[in-house]
A protein has these predicted regions:
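Beta-propeller blade termini and top-face loops
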Residues: 1-221
Length: 221
């Protein structure tokens, strides 16, 4: 399971960002070629995470993490950990283009598991990006949401970032999706959930001014 990204100019090349779908450890990222039926591991930062607390790792990646091609450049692909990463050469090298965009609260990043043994599978890594999109209208306008309830935008390809989280969105919400209207570059949609915190209300927002203000569009959900 996980995010996939199909190469815009070659549908035989597929990228998958999912720790549980392959070997490769923390941040396992695959490049699969249907012609040769070969998989190449192109992890952003190959690092053994077994038995380590997430706070002690250089970078954190969720069990499934965003992998997205730029709509403006088929040679550019993004991957989301606690930072946003970018590659211009099909994942052979990566560059961090953001600071840590999560809350990065150390008390939330310890070892998980029970009293006798700890979970060492790498599944319990939080404070990471849960969704990412580059504006189809404006090259370099990057929107990133996290699993701990923060939304950031960069309008210069990652050089500078601004927090634009809806003020009414409760803390620790899981931002599941950020989408930009196909008809208007300044209309942004956001969906979030808090069911893991025993909150089953829907959280749907729309901004009509590029993230400056947000309105709830829950309606009668």
């Amino acid at each position: 399971s996980g995010f996939i990204a199909v190469h815009p100019e070659d549908p035989n090349i597929v990228y998958s960002g999912a720790v549980g779908s392959s070997p490769g450890g923390n941040g396992a990222l695959q490049r699969y070629d249907h012609r040769t039926r070969q998989i190449q591991m192109i992890n952003v930062w190959p690092e053994e995470s077994t038995g380590f607390a997430p706070k002690d790792l250089k970078y954190r990646f969720a069990w499934t993490f965003p992998v997205v091609f730029s709509p403006h450049d088929s040679n550019t692909i993004y991957a989301g950990g606690n930072h946003l990463f970018r590659s211009h050469n099909e994942g052979q090298s990566w560059q961090a283009i953001s600071p840590d965009l999560s809350r990065n609260r150390s008390e939330k990043l310890g070892l998980s598991g029970g009293a006798l043994t700890v979970d060492s599978a790498g599944a319990e890594q939080y404070a990471t990006l849960s969704t990412f999109v580059e504006s189809p209208h404006r090259s370099g306008e990057l929107w990133a949401g996290t699993d701990d309830g923060l939304l950031h935008v960069s309008r210069d390809g990652g050089s500078h970032w601004r927090k634009v989280t809806p003020k009414a969105l409760p803390e620790w919400s899981y931002i599941g999706a950020v989408e930009i209207s196909a008809h208007n570059a300044d209309i942004i949609y956001l969906s979030a959930t808090r069911y893991k915190l025993d909150d089953y209300d829907p959280y749907l927002y729309r901004s009509q001014d590029g993230g400056k203000t947000w309105q709830s569009i829950n309606g009668n959900f």
